[in-house]
């Protein structure tokens, strides 16, 4: 097994541990406190993070880690960094709703190499390896049974594009949503893009741990990742994931409205 294959298997193992442990809390009443920005963090988030960090400490003791709850851990000189969101979607998780899961990504020399994104309520998992493609699989299936993903690339008028997003209050995008076919809700918008159910996803104000798996998945599936500044940085205010045929038109509209 190559180092890359070992990392892929470890990323899936981390996702499985997170999904299993989170499921034990799901539908219950885990203790909750609020962070300085007002967002909730529950004992489930912290328990999952603790379990993942323990695995990485044992399996990859020299690797750095970035997590939503604990921030940056490990040595800054490490070439390798794991990026974790133990429970992405804490609000729907606490409400007993769908739309939550685990985000796992690995960076090597500041380049995303491996990504796993899960939605346990759907038994769905999307994953990617740089240079080897993006895939989807059902939780519990062997990786060899995974289905490859490819985002359609045909040109598409913006008014016909199915677009969803994570927008901040008073977002400049709100007044122009009617210029496209806006998707109001989804269990996993990025998963919908990867599987052809939407054509673009707008992420306003997301964090690196929210975005890292999605960015590699979309890239490896043949889509575009655009920070509206000519690159694909994960720490900018805006990040757009899109099918190639709609990416330029959508980015142009967002720049026109001041994004």
UniProtKB/Swiss-Prot annotation:
Q: Which Gene3D superfamilies match?
A: 3.40.190.80, Fructose-1,6-Bisphosphatase, subunit A, domain 1
Q: Does the keyword Transferase apply?
A: yes
**What is the protein's given name?**
Glucose-1-phosphate thymidylyltransferase
The reaction(s) catalysed by this protein are: dTTP + alpha-D-glucose 1-phosphate + H(+) = dTDP-alpha-D-glucose + diphosphate
Q: Which UniProt keywords apply?
A: Antibiotic biosynthesis, Streptomycin biosynthesis, Transferase
Top-tier EC class: transferase
State the family it belongs to. Answer: Belongs to the inositol monophosphatase superfamily.
Source organism per entry reads: Streptomyces griseus
Q: In which pathway does it act?
A: Antibiotic biosynthesis; streptomycin biosynthesis
Q: What is its EC number?
A: 2.7.7.24
**SUPFAM superfamilies, per this entry?**
Carbohydrate phosphatase
**GO function term, MF aspect, one:** inositol monophosphate 1-phosphatase activity
Q: Which PANTHER family match?
A: INOSITOL MONOPHOSPHATASE, INOSITOL-1-MONOPHOSPHATASE-RELATED
Q: Name one GO biological process term.
A: inositol metabolic process
Specify the superkingdom: Bacteria
Report the InterPro entries cross-referenced here: Inositol_monophosphatase-like (IPR000760)
